[in-house]
Amino acid sequence: MRLAIDAMGGDHAPEEIIKGSLEALKHFQDIEIVLIGKEEVLRGLQRKEKRLKLVYASEVIENDEAPVTAVRKKKDSSMIVGLELLKKEEVDAFLSAGNTGALMAGALLTLGRIKGIDRPALAPILPTLNGATVLLDAGSNTNCDAQNLVQFAVMGHVYAQKMFEIERPRVGLFNIGAEEEKGNEVVKKAFEELKKSKLNFIGNVEGRDIPYGVCEVVVCDGFVGNAILKSMEGIASVISQLLKEELTRNIFTKLGALLIMGGLKRITKKMDYTEYGGAPLLGIKKPVIKAHGNSKAKAIFNAIKQAKNFVDNDVLNHIKEEIESMGDELSV
């Protein structure tokens, strides 16, 4: 398996991207990595690992650039070069921690959508009390209709099925209340269609339900999804900081911390977003993974692991098959 990595994308590029990629090569003996970036940055890395290939790109799409404009103007950027390699099937997946909007725009323009999907969705995995939950959309589509939400549900169902190894993952529709009549017209219409579908639809879920892991898939528009994602990241960070402050307050709390250190480490690990890799762009014709913009080596390593699992489990073809099998159910 050959994975392409954007070495120039993200807040800590290129150093942490390179470090995470080299670590993945040590850990996974059945992968090759193609690092894409500026020659002056990557030159000399070839000798470090025989399964590492370098592809030079003279441009970088920055986080503050307008996505569509950057994609059209910077054809020799590390991001677009990587997507082109994927289009030509020279690699099996592409991963970037760079500009999210540019990655989505570039993937759409370069690779296109799966037949039957109107809009691709960003699908991160969130840690919960009972395991993990797929959230989609997490920011790609701020305005959605009911048909978009139903399509997100189908893609999320397949993704959770393959990645979590659950035959019938529970699908919930994010809403302001659990009652069927709650929400705007788009959400109400999506509820009716999901209720009629063959998915394991459990109904509406509220924000407070998500951390408890009441379902394996949460469906919403990108505006709401991004707010959920950022809120949960912020809360996890605050809890971690509060625990650290309280447990180091004095000698007695420090002694108590020693007694529960094992449990604290497990909690911290479970709440750490870097443990969950990146978010696939579900609905794109080829495997594209978006790593967190703040990713360091550990997060990049786990995003590569996720990309590998995504390809190994043939998630895209299973999504295509599910879309074809549901047919008219996806037309709202």
Curated annotation (Swiss-Prot):
Its EC number is 2.3.1.274. GO terms for biological process: fatty acid biosynthetic process; phospholipid biosynthetic process. InterPro entries: FA_synthesis, Phospholipid_synth_PlsX-like. It catalyses: a fatty acyl-[ACP] + phosphate = an acyl phosphate + holo-[ACP]. One of its GO terms (molecular function) is phosphate:acyl-[acyl carrier protein] acyltransferase activity. Pathway: Lipid metabolism; phospholipid metabolism. It is an enzyme of class 2 (transferase). Its main location: cytoplasm. The keyword Transferase applies. Disulfide bonds: none annotated. It is found in: Cytoplasm. Belongs to the PlsX family. This is Phosphate acyltransferase.
